[in-house]
Amino acid sequence: MNKKYEPLHDDFPATNVLKRSQAIFGRDYQMGIVVEECSELQKELLKNTNRKKDNLPEIIDETADVYIGLLHVIISYDINGPVAQRVKEKLDRLNERLKIRETTSSVEEYTKAIEAKKAKEAQKVK
């Protein structure tokens, strides 16, 4: 990749700790932990939203674990720049969709507007 990206974490202080962890435990082991932590966060979020459980401390704890796990993924695959670029693109797209939603009166109208925008963009590609 020749693109220049603005990194998510440039010289992030935890980088050395995370690299040591991968050197000691191995990348595959760490990726398994990341999957496990994502599952634990999912469980806590579902408890909160579906069962209305007051579990903010657990959500904070699992979010921190997932955040560390995502840093493991970024470092392990050396994808800091490309991930930063995709985050920017996805936030830009969300911002555009929010602008559309703010000008529509219903979810149905919003959905039609998004579909029309996609069709228009597809025509540009042809």
Could you describe each region identified by the protein language model?
Residues M1-K126:
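Flexible "arm" and connector segments at domain edges
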